[in-house]
Amino acid sequence: MLLDFLSGKHREPAECIIKVDGEEIAHLYPFLTEVHVECSRGDAWSGTLRFESRRDENGVWSVQDDPAIRPWKPIVIEAAFGTTVEEIVRGYIREVVADYPEDPGATTVTVELQDDSIAMDREHVRKAWGNEVPTTDAAILLDILSKYPLSPDPENGAGLDGLTVNQNATDIRFLRARAEANGYELILDRGLLYFGPMRLEADAQETILVYAGRDTHCFRFDVRADGHQPDAVGYDVAPETGSEPVHQDVQPDVPSLGTEPADSVDSGLSPFIWRLDRPGSVSAAELDAYARGRANELSMRVRAQGELDGSLYGHVLRVGLPVGVDGIGTTMQGIYYVDSVTHVFSVDGYRESFTLLRNAYGDNLEGGTSVLAGVL
């Protein structure tokens, strides 16, 4: 254990723990060469385990003949930081690929996995929700989740009500469509399904430190601000009288992640509004919710990318939650929103590559003063 005398934190090399059917596959670790996990707000989380494999005198291969390496086996990948263990992803083995090249000593096995959403993508369902009595998104979600070993996140949004909607898809595809209709995120993490707006006001994760001397754990970081994204999203609705459509403009309604808006409202130019085409089968309430979701997403004009030394950071950086960034100047540093994270365990250690989003400029870290003040 290494003690960081500046921060008082303990730093230990991160270890990867893999469990299949609830049992750690430690006997296969000597053959494991890389673990790669992709997590994002918009897609199913997926991962890849790469193994070398050896054949014994009885013709049995160490990895591909192991009963744990089978499609549809439940799998959990965790990161251990000393005595603290944090989950990265859980789901199922999706595919097993054994590669037998000319040299038998170079035989490899690749295991592909996907998060819990894959179990919700097996049965095509045709159902009329709210056919007898109009229903709500919250009720639909609870009904669907009752079929799976998943729980609704306590912070879920209410969604729309008064619904009569047809499902003609697998459960996960239908729920993703409902999330989009509400302007919501849909994230499966640690056995919970989150169905709600961006959680910009949640507690921030451990601050990412750039150029922080011996406390540095982010060794690559770049940030860009794209001004060519609209300040509002508009759509047309049918008038109560007459034939001319009525224009509605929807502004973002998410909290600011800084002290200065990153929009162009005060630029002195004409209003920056993008208009949506309205599908004929969408209600006015659903169109308004969708437009607001698009406006909120488009307000995230500041985008940062970088890479952490996971062992030094000491945590699994979680998607769909805020995180502070310090050491990049008073304009760009502050609270960001985690859009995606790629976790890699290899001979180089534990690396976390990330994409962060922000809708404002200015340092809004807790206390208003950089924790790196005085660090050159």
Question: Where does each model-flagged region fall?
Answer:
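Assembly/oligomerization scaffold segments
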Residues: 1-113, 118
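Short beta-strand-centered interaction patches in the first periplasmic/extracellular domains
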Residues: 2-4, 106-111, 115-117, 154-224
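Short acidic/polar beta-strand-loop edge motifs in secreted extracellular
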Residues: 62, 119-143, 152-177, 181, ...
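Glycine-centered loop/turn motifs
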Residues: 70-76, 210-215, 320
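Short glycine/serine/proline-enriched coil/turn segments at secondary-structure junctions
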Residues: 84-85, 101-104, 187, 194, ...
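Short, compositionally biased
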Residues: 90-100, 199-202, 336-347
